């Protein structure tokens, strides 16, 4: 009787393990399929615009900044008008990104999408920009009202 009980418990354990592994594999496959159906380009554009700015960093000392210092009023007027278009475009990228990412049904899958963006874009960035990108990706997750991203590791280990 004891051998039968042990055998039965072992059999139940194996069935439970197989079902669990099958469910996990199904979730992985489902997320992979969802990611293939989502266009991450608007997200990548939005993030790159955020981390690279629009040329108005104070530490840049190029000709445009020199012109800005010598003709401040006129250039500011032009830049304000340009900024509106760029802001609208940036807002458009963010909105398109949120729409695309809303197709991903779970926080884990959304995290994988953010990790993919990080992986795709971070190769050409300096360490400081990579850190800023991590921060902007988390901000994007908040703005798009994704699920909890607490356990989402975006750090790039290059």
UniProtKB/Swiss-Prot annotation:
The keyword Transmembrane does not apply. A motif (Cell attachment site) lies at residues 54-56. Residues 65-81 form a propeptide. One of its GO terms (molecular function) is nutrient reservoir activity. Keywords: Disulfide bond, Seed storage protein, Signal, Storage protein. Expressed in cotyledons. Maximal expression in parenchyma cells undergoing DNA endoreduplication and cell expansion but not in actively dividing cells of the cotyledon. InterPro entries: Bifun_inhib/LTP/seed_sf, Bifunc_inhib/LTP/seed_store, Napin/2SS/CON. Residues 1-21 form the signal peptide. This is a 2S seed storage protein. The protein consists of two chains linked by 2 disulfide bonds. PANTHER family: 2S SEED STORAGE PROTEIN 1-RELATED. Belongs to the 2S seed storage albumins family. This is 2S seed storage albumin protein. The lineage of its organism: Eukaryota, Viridiplantae, Streptophyta, Embryophyta, Tracheophyta.
């Amino acid at each position: 009787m004891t051998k039968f009980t042990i055998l039965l418990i072992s059999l139940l354990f194996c069935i439970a393990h197989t079902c669990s592994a099958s469910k996990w594999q199904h979730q992985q496959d489902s997320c992979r399929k969802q990611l293939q159906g989502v266009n991450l380009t608007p997200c990548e554009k939005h993030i790159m615009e955020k981390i690279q700015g629009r040329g108005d960093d104070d530490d840049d000392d190029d000709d445009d900044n020199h012109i800005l210092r010598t003709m401040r009023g006129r250039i500011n007027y032009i830049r304000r008008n340009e900024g509106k278009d760029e802001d609208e475009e940036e807002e458009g990228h963010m909105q398109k990104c949120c729409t695309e990412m809303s197709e991903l049904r779970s926080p884990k899958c959304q995290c994988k999408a953010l990790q993919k963006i990080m992986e795709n874009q971070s190769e050409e960035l300096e360490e400081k920009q990579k850190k800023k990108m991590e921060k902007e990706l988390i901000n994007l997750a908040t703005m798009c009202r994704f699920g909890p991203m607490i356990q989402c590791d975006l750090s790039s280990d290059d």
